[in-house]
Amino acid sequence: MGIAGTDPVLAPVDVLVRTFNSATTLSACLAAAKRHLPVRRIIVVDRNSTDDTAEIARAFGAELHFEEAGIGRATTLAARLAETENVLYLDSDVILRSASFYSDAVRALALPRTGAVVGIAIGHRFRFGLPLGLTLLRRAWVLSIDIPDDAQGAETYFLRRALKREHRRVRYVSGAMDHLGTYRGKGWAEWQGAQLRLAAGWSISTIIDSFLVILLIHANSRSPRNVLYTPIFFLHLLRGFTDPSRWRMRDRRTVSLAYGRRGQTATSREPPVCEGGGSEERLIP
């Protein structure tokens, strides 16, 4: 359910999409955004995709920009290019379903001590973290945060750290979207662990938070197999966390496999766990 209240007159919003090789899902993503949002501009920051991502973005009238530094660079660049007071980060594998999400999110962001509003996937019971799959933020605040350009899988750590420092909270809107998900290849957990270590340093609390996030991600999948796999996945993540020099240099694109439908069996031994690129499903807490 959304946040109760009378819908305000909603100002148009710049929609920010960071992506790579998302031709399979991008059309549905952008079509849903245009259907349910008062879009002012769609700004796509692409990591030089090798499929039809760029052509699809242009067909929807999106402004297309390219980067090779990392998702941290894409996150900041998109906000710099935007002009609206609030910006909506949208992942290319997220399909917005709720016509009321944006009005709910605008009202929530206006509440005291609120720094971000996250849309939750349909059917997901557990809320956590600060992914950027469907997330409304104040543009000026995003630009005030120093996110390293080469941040790969832990760029939101810097946003979460700022919220904690400012004593602001994340609010959530349930039943907002479907996350089609991206299945990850061998070494994905280790790579995530390495990126977390590089962002947060050696921190016991960060390790504990990581385990809890993984557990909640798997619980949201409602798959006993995924839940039982949690300790094994966490051990893989710890391997990357404790030896970041070995795992950090892998290009993010080499550990990303093909897009697929929810519930489809993953091609690797690991269960189908989404990066957050989409909903609240992010391995980095």
For the regions a protein language model found, what residue spans apply to each?
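Acidic helix N-cap motif at the loop->helix transition within catalytic regions
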Residues: 24-27, 51-59
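Short, acidic, metal-binding catalytic loop of nucleotide-sugar glycosyltransferases
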Residues: 31-40
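A conserved acidic beta->alpha catalytic loop
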Residues: 46-54, 95
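Glycine-rich, basic loop-to-helix element that forms the pyrophosphate-binding segment
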Residues: 66-82, 129
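Short aromatic/hydrophobic "clamp" motif used to bind/position activated sugar donors
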Residues: 87
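Conserved donor NDP-sugar-binding/catalytic core segment of glycosyltransferases
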Residues: 95, 99-129
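Acidic donor-binding loop at a coil-to-helix junction in glycosyltransferase catalytic cores
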Residues: 152-161
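Non-catalytic, C-terminal membrane-associated alpha-helical segments of glycosyltransferases
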Residues: 184-285
